[in-house]
């Protein structure tokens, strides 16, 4: 696999997990700051735990990728 392809795959993975992190944060923000959103779920604690786990998993994946593979040259923006 070429260096360019490797960089693109790395960038795609980071972007994927950042999107998952953003989604989880957005959902948790709604639950924490909007009582209307909370009223729709009878089991709010399980929902909060589910989204907290998704947030933690995404952050862990990003950290793991950066720790193990960030020594690659920076990916050009564009």
Enumerate the language-model features and the residues they cover.
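Extended, charge-rich alpha-helical interface modules
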Residues: 2-78
């Amino acid at each position: 696999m070429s260096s360019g392809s490797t960089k693109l795959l790395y960038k795609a993975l980071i972007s994927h997990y950042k999107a998952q992190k953003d989604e989880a944060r957005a959902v948790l923000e709604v639950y924490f700051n909007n009582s209307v959103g909370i009223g729709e779920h009878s089991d709010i604690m399980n929902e909060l735990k589910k989204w907290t786990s998704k947030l933690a998993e995404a952050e862990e994946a990003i950290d793991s990728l950066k720790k193990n593979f960030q020594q690659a040259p920076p990916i050009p923006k564009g």
